[in-house]
Amino acid sequence: LLNKDVLSSTLASILALHKWGLGQHHIAKGLHFLELNFASATDNSQITPLGFDIVFPAMLDHAADLSLNLRLDPTTLNDLMNRRDLELQRCTENGSAETEVYMAYIGEGMGKLHDWESVMKYQRKNGSLFNSPSTTAAAFIALRNSDCLNYLYSALNKFGSAVPAVYPLDIYSQLCIVDNLERLGISRFFSTEIQSVLDETYRCWLQGDEEIFMDASTCGLAFRTLRMNGYNVTSDPITKILQECFSSSFRGNMTDINTTLEIYRASELILYPEERDLDQHNLRLKTFLEQELSSNGFIQSCQLGRNINAEVNQAIEYPFYAIMDRMAKRKNIENYNIDNTRILKTSYRSPNFGNKDFLSLSVEDFNRCQVIHREELRELERWVIENRLDELKFARSKAAYCYFSAAATIFSPELSDARMSWAKNALMTTMVDDLFDVTGSVEEMKNLIQLVELWDVDVSTECCSHKVQILFSALKRTICEVGDRAYQLQGRSIRSHIIVIWLDTLHSMMKEVEWTRDKFVPTMDEYVSNAYVSFALGPIVLPALYLVGPKLSEEMVNHSEYHNLFKLMSTCGRLMNDIRGYEREHDDGKLNAMSLYIMNNGGEITPEVAILEIKSWNDRQRRDLLSLVLEEKSVIPKACKDLFWHMCSVVHLFYNKDDGFWSQELIEVVNQVIHQPILLN
């Protein structure tokens, strides 16, 4: 599949040896190989390197000038030369800035047709043109530029008699290591090394290093990696690349699919209002990637062994904010290719692009964590029975789903207490929500609130029903158990805080019941200020913060940053829920953000328009949340802030399609994350 690449490299070597007057035996073998395999030069099933149809014929012309006796099939040769003429005509007629750059990049194929003085505007500080040894060598032959020569000497000093397709590639290759470690879920084992690479990359970013900013792939990867690790980087370079390289035909001549995918991922990371132009660019790139998927446009990358279709499909179907950590890691492991050969003018590869040891470690770690997670799920199922929750047939007692949301986000083996707190409280909120939303009487709702307020009560006499008795007893045991675990880590009692979290949730649920009963129509502000609490993420996330490691003082949990994180996360969940549940709640006579928005506009807008507006609102909330989570100088520890973002990802995944609790797709994901170990071919 790389025969065209091999033909090109072989002929280049023959020309060099002939010029130096060396290796006659090797020249003869090379010529024989070219003659035997020349048909591949026009074989459309072969992978075509960038500029091959111009560069390879130019080398054949040069071979003829040197009187090298090549006995080539005349039909194939004519076909090849016709392709060159058509490609040159296409580029000349196009006349775009992208095409001008492309023609400069493949300058070694243009020879004397080039205005080399104009091409030199692309020369970089290191003396190269496009960090390409071959283009730079062609420029030196034409102009005898000393900076070009110094660059070529530096490449030869580093690599000896053979140089790579791209040099230097240091920043990109190091970032590939970091990206691989993060995407495979094993970055926690290399935190010191990763920090060193990120600090050095940030230093280069601040200095405007050409190795970053003159290469779209490196710039996209550097921006995404630095921003997601809390470094203050502007999106301006990404916008510039999108305008210059993807403006007219989405993907220019200089950009391979790896670059397109990298820039697409970078364009998702919008944090600030002034970056909203990236939205349109991101949408255009998404459309392009979808078209390439449907037309099998990634066939070259797939032929190289890389499962690019799966990578692109994952990026499109699951935005970075709508996929749980463990779910993403498994997909990345399964799609990982240790070969990962790249194609520009020639093929090139690096162990930093695909590493067998990284893959082995990631599989071992994933499966080891799975064993722990399965045991914890069994423990949770025992806990359900011990607390008689299985007797409440009305409840969506989906222990596996509730545990899945914990294990898929807080996966490290040592964070078992945080996972169990998350899962148990998630199950309790599900059952309490059903009591308030579906099956409970007003008397039962008020009774449950009163029991939590009084706390020390005789459940045999104070509970108005069997199900309230079971719910309160299980809730009390859960709060006490989580409080005891947290006390060991925090060195102070936080039980009263967990009780307050639950009471806030119960009171907000009760207010919604009363609004529906009394047919009261709140303002949008009144609704949202209550609804983000009643969405009931507080009891799941907030107690778990005490169990992920860092000390959380009372001053921290009373700080505005803590409350902003909670409000933004919960508002995202509420808005996503209201979009998904609009028709059902409308039929039940219940108000939500969708129906209120339509009412506030005089009932003159359609639900489709309302959905767009609520989604836009949700986007702003999500971006504000991510900005807070990534903020380096903050009151709340990063490990705690991450939980707010993880839960935001959970709700975006669950409400992305149909009711997540009953989705067949989600059942399969639960099995992949918890039950099915990864088996490599």
Curated annotation (Swiss-Prot):
CDD domains: Terpene_cyclase_plant_C1. Mg(2+) 1 binds at residues 433, 437. This is Terpene synthase 6, chloroplastic. Keywords: Chloroplast, Lyase, Magnesium, Metal-binding, Plastid. Its main location: plastid. Mg(2+) 2 binds at residues 433, 437. Mg(2+) 3 binds at residues 577, 585. Pfam families: Terpene_synth (PF01397), Terpene_synth_C (PF03936). The lineage of its organism: Eukaryota, Viridiplantae, Streptophyta, Embryophyta, Tracheophyta. It is an enzyme of class 4 (lyase). GO terms for molecular function: magnesium ion binding; terpene synthase activity. May be involved in the biosynthesis of ent-kaurene diterpenoids natural products such as oridonin, miltiradiene, eriocalyxin B and nezukol, known to exhibit antitumor, anti-inflammatory and antibacterial activities. The Asp-Asp-Xaa-Xaa-Asp/Glu (DDXXD/E) motif is important for the catalytic activity, presumably through binding to Mg(2+). SUPFAM superfamilies: Terpenoid cyclases/Protein prenyltransferases (SSF48239), Terpenoid synthases (SSF48576). One of its GO terms (cellular component) is chloroplast. InterPro entries: Isoprenoid_synthase_dom_sf, Terpene_cyclase_plant_C1, Terpene_synth_N, Terpene_synth_N_sf, Terpene_synthase-like, Terpene_synthase_metal-bd, Terpenoid_cyclase/PrenylTrfase. Belongs to the terpene synthase family. Disulfide bonds: none annotated. Its cofactor is Mg(2+). A motif (DDXXD motif) lies at residues 433-437. Binds 3 Mg(2+) ions per subunit. Its EC number is 4.2.3.-. It comes from Isodon rubescens.
